[in-house]
Amino acid sequence: RLMPLMILETHAHADHLSGAQVLKEHYPSAQIGVGNKISLVQETFKEFFDLPVDFPTDGSQFDRLFDDREIVRAGSLQFEVIFTPGHTPACTTFRFDDAIFTGDTMFMPDFGTGRCDFPAGSAGDLYDSITTRLFCLPDETRVFVGHDYQPGGRALQYETTIGEQKRHNIQ
């Protein structure tokens, strides 16, 4: 039986809730990890949504706060943390060998990218994250996206490549 050691958050923001805490209830020894810029999102939302004064904005709700370009070991796996701000200032992509998990930074090429109209989102940062931090990866790098909205009613897809993104991403 496999036991997860880490639960990775690519980002957090106000339009959806994370399932990480539910997973943590089932696997209490697993660490929840997120990029250390999460405090920027927490500060923004604390002000924007008038959260209680004592709401912590230091990322203390998470077990691990990752640094950009940090190499992390989890059991026999190793991954790289790549900050990819834009959708939120704290968006993070995780690279495992020849695969990346982008959250809302990139979607399938026929849908484009995540929104950047949330508080503290930035179209310029999102563009730079994709073109300078992800498009420098080999074209054959597998990309696992955070959502697939199935434009035109096509079948669900969740995997593409950096090469496909470069050639066909509509954004």
Place the predicted regions along the sequence by residue:
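Metallo-beta-lactamase
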Residues: 44, 51, 78-83, 88-171
